[in-house]
């Protein structure tokens, strides 16, 4: 965490209350809006003489900005000059910055572009709980807590810029970034501080009520006393134990003692009473169509789950082995030993879900309800201990023992290392009398379109032409019979004799009659 506000003043000047030209009449901004706008635009001198704001009030607001406005990361509260009049009212402030405005604008664009990656995936029709949950999981999966930075004071990535660049940081990095993204989509949030535990997290307002959210603590890290970690992050895993908690719930552990919200008073967090099957999810949650999906190794779940409302859940694939003594599912090795956890990630690409078990990496096509194993060569004698995915790039960890010993990392790219596997033809646009339609073949793995064909407009179709040669004869009859028998999967649209959108035995009978001259 940052230390408490430290404002450096090079000079404080007192001036008499003599008459000055009025600016406030021309400027309807409050002093808070004026200060925020000035820092946001990297102004070096702020004239506040007609706002009649007390110095203490202004400095209280500056402290609020320092902690609660992460987009002002470039401002370290270095005040070069503070001038007040004989009434203790602030006249002007002079600031210094550690970079140029041009550099800041480039950085600001980078921050917006990086956070757009998650914002663009959020449906405006989701509830605020679902939006906050999705962002919580995105941060947990794509970023990691960095103990190296924490152990070296002065090197921590506290601000959102370096956190988004390095994908690593400390608690304040998570909290600042979470707060920034939430506010961009219209959800209010503040930074919470426990100086006693040197820790920071957020409060979030959902449907008018406030809750604690600690993304840092929900991003599990590998930490075994006396042993150097191979990989700090449990790759792909997400916890939800610190999502939407009350004041009394957040202090039940030893890392949230005597907390306060810098610059903000009166917020009381209460217990969440909505549907919350996500609490036992061990991966990020993903929305495809009308369902949310996640992995859950709790006793009453044990696999890939889906739900429409986070109340009524359905297991669509059992994963792992249920160990009665522990009360949850884990990895089962060939020698009979059990790893009491899902060391797994769940990711969405093109509407397909990718996840791992101890021995396989699967892709689930929710549209067709099809599971397929992804053709990746698991290292001999090793089991999967984590999965991550960035676009088409799949990264995994594998080990014969655990995450502390003999860990290897592998990387595969869909469409490159994993070749496309085509589906059957699917019509994505039906032809009309005057307009062509289109049919495509998708890849089973990545859902990319790997082949396209135009379906001629109905006015140009020769009814009975099953093989596309624009002639009608017994060859078309044979092609149609083979298609209906499942032997031939290719058929021309002309075989749909009654134009009902389906090719079946009725069309076969009609074609026979046509060839017979009826």
Label every PLM stretch briefly.
Residues 4-5, 18-117, 306-309, 318-321, ...:
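Linear, non-domain "peripheral" regions
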Residues 9, 13-17, 182:
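Hydrophobic core
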Residues 19-23, 458-518:
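Cellulosome-associated attachment modules in secreted, modular CAZymes
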Residues 100-163:
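Secondary-structure boundary elements
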Residues 173-244:
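Hydrophobic/aromatic-rich core segments of domains that either
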Residues 275-287, 322-348, 378-391:
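Repeated scaffold domains used in trafficking and secretory/extracellular systems
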Residues 293-296, 355-356, 395-398:
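Residue position within the beta-strands of beta-propeller blades
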Residues 418-460:
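Extracellular modular ligand-binding repeats in secreted and cell-surface proteins
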């Amino acid at each position: 965490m940052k230390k408490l506000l430290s404002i450096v003043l090079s000079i404080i000047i007192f001036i008499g209350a003599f008459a000055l030209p009025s600016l406030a009449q021309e400027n309807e901004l409050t002093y808070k809006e004026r200060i925020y706008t000035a820092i946001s635009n990297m102004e070096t001198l702020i004239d506040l003489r007609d706002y009649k704001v007390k110095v203490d009030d202004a400095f209280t607001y500056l402290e609020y900005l320092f902690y609660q406005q992460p987009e002002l990361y470039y401002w370290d509260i270095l005040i070069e000059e503070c001038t007040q009049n004989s009434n203790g009212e602030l006249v002007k402030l002079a600031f210094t910055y550690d970079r140029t405005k041009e550099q800041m604008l480039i950085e600001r664009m980078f921050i917006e572009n990086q956070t757009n990656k998650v914002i663009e995936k959020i449906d405006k029709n989701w509830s605020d709980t679902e939006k906050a949950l999705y962002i919580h999981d995105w941060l947990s999966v794509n970023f990691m807590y960095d103990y190296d930075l924490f152990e070296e004071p002065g090197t921590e990535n506290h601000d959102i810029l370096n956190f988004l660049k390095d994908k690593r940081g400390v608690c304040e990095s998570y909290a600042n970034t979470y707060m920034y993204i939430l506010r961009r989509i219209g959800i209010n949030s503040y930074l919470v501080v426990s100086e006693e535990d040197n820790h920071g997290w957020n409060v979030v307002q959902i449907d008018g009520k406030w809750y604690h959210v600690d993304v840092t603590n929900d991003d599990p890290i590998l930490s075994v006393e006396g042993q150097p970690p191979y990989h700090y992050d449990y790759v792909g895993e997400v916890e939800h134990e610190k999502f939407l908690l009350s004041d009394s719930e957040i202090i039940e552990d030893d890392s949230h003692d005597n907390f306060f919200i810098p610059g903000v008073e009166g917020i009381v967090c209460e217990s969440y009473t909505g549907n919350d099957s996500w609490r036992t999810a061990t991966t990020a949650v993903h929305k495809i169509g009308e369902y949310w999906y996640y992995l859950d190794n709790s006793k009453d779940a044990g696999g890939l789950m889906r739900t429409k409302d986070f109340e009524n859940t359905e297991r669509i694939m059992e994963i792992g082995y249920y160990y009665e003594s522990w009360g949850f599912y884990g990895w089962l090795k060939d020698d009979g030993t059990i790893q009491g956890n899902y060391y797994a990630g769940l990711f969405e690409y093109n509407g397909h879900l990718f996840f791992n078990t101890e021995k396989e990496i699967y892709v689930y096509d929710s549209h067709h309800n099809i599971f397929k194993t992804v053709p990746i060569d698991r290292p001999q004698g090793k089991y999967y201990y984590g999965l991550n995915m960035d676009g088409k790039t799949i990264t995994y960890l594998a080990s014969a023992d655990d995450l502390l010993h003999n860990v290897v990392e592998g990387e595969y790219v869909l469409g490159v290392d994993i070749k496309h596997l085509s589906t059957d033809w699917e019509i994505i646009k039906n032809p009309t009398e005057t307009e062509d339609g289109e049919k495509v073949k998708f890849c089973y793995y990545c859902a990319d379109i790997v082949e396209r064909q135009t379906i001629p407009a109905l006015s140009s179709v020769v009814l009975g032409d099953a093989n596309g040669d624009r002639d009608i004869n017994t060859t078309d009859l044979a092609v149609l019979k083979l298609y209906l028998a499942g032997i031939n999967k290719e058929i021309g649209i002309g075989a749909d004799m009654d134009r009902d959108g389906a090719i079946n035995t009725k069309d076969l009978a009609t074609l026979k009659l046509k060839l017979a001259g009826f």
